[in-house]
Every structure is written in C-alpha cells, then in structure tokens.
Amino acid sequence: MSKRYQRSNTLLPSPVGAPFRLAVVQFTVPGAKNGGSDKGPDGNRVDSIPIANGVIHAGGACDLLKFDSGIGDADACVAAFDTAANQYDALIVRINPGQLSQGTPQGTQAAFDALMNMYIARGKLIWSSPKIQTQMGAKDALVHISKLNCGLEDTYAYYTEEELFVGFKKTCAFQPRVLKQNRGSAGEGIWLCWLWDKNSNTKVERYPATYLGEKVLKDNDYLKLMEMNDNHVEFHTVKEFMIFCVDGPTGQGAGSWKSTFPGEYLKGGKAAHGQLVDQRLLPRIDEGEVRILMAGDTCQMAIHKKPLGGGLSAVGGNSEYTYYRPTDAKYFGLVQKLYADIPKLLPSLELEGEPLPLLWTCDYIPKNPDTWPKGPYDRSCPDAETEYTVGEFNCSCVGISKFQAVCGGEKTLADVPDADYFDACELTDLMGIKAIEMLVKAKEDRAAKMLAEAVGCGCWVGPRGNPLMKVEVTENGCTCAVQ
C-alpha cells in the first residue's frame, strides 16, 4: 500500500491556493452502456479519478470535466466546452480515439481537435495534443526515429502502390521483413514475411540478395505470412500479397485470404494516414516485447510481454506479463538509452515545442547487435549486450491495466483490489508530479521569453506587467534601473 496517501475512490478536494488548475476531460458516448466500454456505472473512466487525485497529491487543483455533445451542432458543443475549459491551465484528455465521432454532430472530432490546437498555440498544455497523437502514434514514426538509439536504420515507409511494390520486392529479397499498416491497434494488418520454397514446402534459408538492392523479388516468388493479431499463417505469391495490401482480398489477382481484416492499407493516401512501414524482422521477437511505461520523461515500469503457446504475437490476451522496476538490471540499460533519446525524440518526429505525453508507451523488440559474431538468430547474447528497437509508440489515451479490469460493467473503482489499486496509483501519482513539473517549466520558459523580448526592446518588466525594472541595451551591454 501507499505509505503517503490513503485510498480514495472519489475525487479529493483540491488544495486551497494551488498554483495550477487542471481538468481531466472525459466524454459520454450517447447510447453506450456506462457511456463507453472504458467507463464504470458512474460514467467516469475508471482511471480518471485516480489521475485527478494524482494531480491533487502533487499540489495542483484538478476537476473532472465532460464534453457534452448534446448542446447543438459541433460548433455549439465545442463553444460550450471552451467556456468551461478556458479557466484551466492544462487539460488531461482521456477520450478514446474515435469516441467523439460516435453519436455526435458531424465534425465534432475535428472541431474539438481544432480547439485543442488553439489552446496549445496560446500556451495551454494539452495531454496528449492531436498532433502528438497523430504523428507519434503513426507507424511512420519508426522511420523518423531510425537513427536514434531506439530505432532501426533499415526502416521504410510506403504511401503509394509504386513505392510498396518497388520497396518490398527489394527489402524482402535480402532478409525477412515485417509490414505494418498504420490503422488498427491489436496487431491486425501487421504481417511477418518470409520467403518460402513452395516445391519443398520449407523456409528459404539463403535469400537471393547478399546486400540490400542487389536483387529484387519477382511477382511469382512465394511468401509465408503471419498476421500478428491472431498468429494465423497464409501462403501467397508476392503479387497476391501486394494486391491484397492495396486493393484488399477482392482485388483482381489477390487470391484467397483467411485474414478477417480487409487489407487496403494505402487507402486514402498519406493525407488519410494510409501507409505501410517496412522493417527488418527481428528473429528474437518470439521472446516477446518489452513495454516501457512512461509518465512524461520518466519510466514508471518495464513490462515483459511473452507470447503464449510458442506464438510470435504478444498482443492482448496472447501473452503473459512480468513487471520490472526501471532500476532492475535486466532493462536498466534500455531505460537509460531511452532517456538519452528523449531530447531528440520529438524533434525527430517534427514535434519540437510540443510537451511529451503525460502517459505513453514504447514497445521494444530484442535483437542481437549487428556485429554479434554468431549472427541475429543466436540466443546466447546476454542481457547486458542485447539491443532493443521500438516497434510502436502509443500515446492515445493509454489505459492503466489494473484499473481497466473493472471497466464496462457494474463494477466501480471501489471494486479494484487494494494491491492493484495502490500499484496503479504509483503511476497516476507520478503522472500528477510530471504534470506539475511540466507546467512549472512552461511558466518559467514563458517568463524567460518575455524577459528576453523585454531586454531586446528596452522595456519595463516585472510580474504581471508591473514596471519594476527598466532594461537598457547599450554598446557595452545591458544596464538595469530598479523602479
């Protein structure tokens, strides 16, 4: 149990004179039980009260604030929300992606996102901003981070049919690959790809190219494909697979498919987030993924997700979980390398100036160093020398698993066992600390910018615009006269 705070299943009173006011933003889906599968019978996300209480524990004021879609059209709904939200210094948006398009006036999601972007432009902190969710959560983020510690250099993005056909035929002629669609969150449209000898019904051990670009695959070359949502296996020619990716299973020449998802991964083009990302298949993926759970710039937990039954997918219920502190030796080096990457992470994603998400995850896959003498398939590489590469970022309303267990039914936060409650509150309390830290830094940065501008023009500067000091810029430097 927490040594500092007693359990609270309801929102705590905010401290008097708190330096910052925050709100946890929620939305009730019209007609859905509890207002959505992420909520309890009180209509709140089960993690919303602990997140708000985490802010309160850290010294901030925090309320629960709901977006109401029943006021009128999208503009009217957003205007009413703006009136309520404008009083806060920061918003923690806990609305699942897509919920604002369920039973709402047309254009609600776009109008809400525009309001969040306007707040950000004015200096209000939003976790997570629409831009962060779109660009950090997109699969082509893996291309942008390819030169960081957490990236894989031979990572490519395809936005057109021509890019896909040319690129994949080149990469898969050299080594096994993983193709990842941009849409979906449970492994659908993520394909592991191996060359297969159809005549002998065996895996091809020696690929045609000895280096990338030496040779390319032909349309009739044969592939073994595994989809990560359920580990099912299919065999297709390169041409059939490419047609499925572009036109779906009914595309002319696509062959017969078992996948329950429709392909068409490039549909709508780049503007509609249609894309495929092509990465090297790391053979140690069967050891599972390592999820690094982050609050702002701090790791709260490392979670090893091991596939069950000899599978390769650690998605959802297909895996068993082992939890590690960030200081545990097994993943300490991984966490430290992530910390080293953080200052470069958002700039590499063209997100410089945006705040880090308040709650986000990185899913890592283990690999042997490229210089490992025994090659990528060897399993004798020790923990200290094992490298890790990011397979996915998630920053879109990340759930807190030990609270999620009571979502969607008749149970409430009070039904979460004490051990799970206090474990989960370690994360929500850290989120509160990080939220206040980021607000303090944002305030300091604004003050420094104002001072720099004042120095540049020789203005009077002081708290809240009070003329306490006159800064004069001369050839010999700056002089200050105190009022």
Please describe what each predicted stretch is.
Residues 188, 194-352, 362-380:
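Phosphate-binding site of ATP-dependent enzymes
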Residues 2-18:
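Short N-terminal or domain-adjacent regulatory/targeting segments
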Residues 2-3, 101-102, 284-287, 298, ...:
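ATP-dependent carboxylate activation and anion-phosphoryl transfer catalytic cores
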Residues 29-30, 70, 97-98, 133, ...:
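Short, solvent-exposed loop/turn segments at secondary-structure junctions
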Residues 29-31, 38-173, 185:
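Conserved N-proximal alpha/beta basic substrate-recognition cap immediately N-terminal to
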Residues 16-39:
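Nucleotide-activated donor-dependent transferases that construct or modify glycoconjugates
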Residues 479-483:
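A positional/structural detector of protein chain ends, strongest at the extreme C-terminus
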Residues 23, 92-94, 178, 277:
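Structural motif
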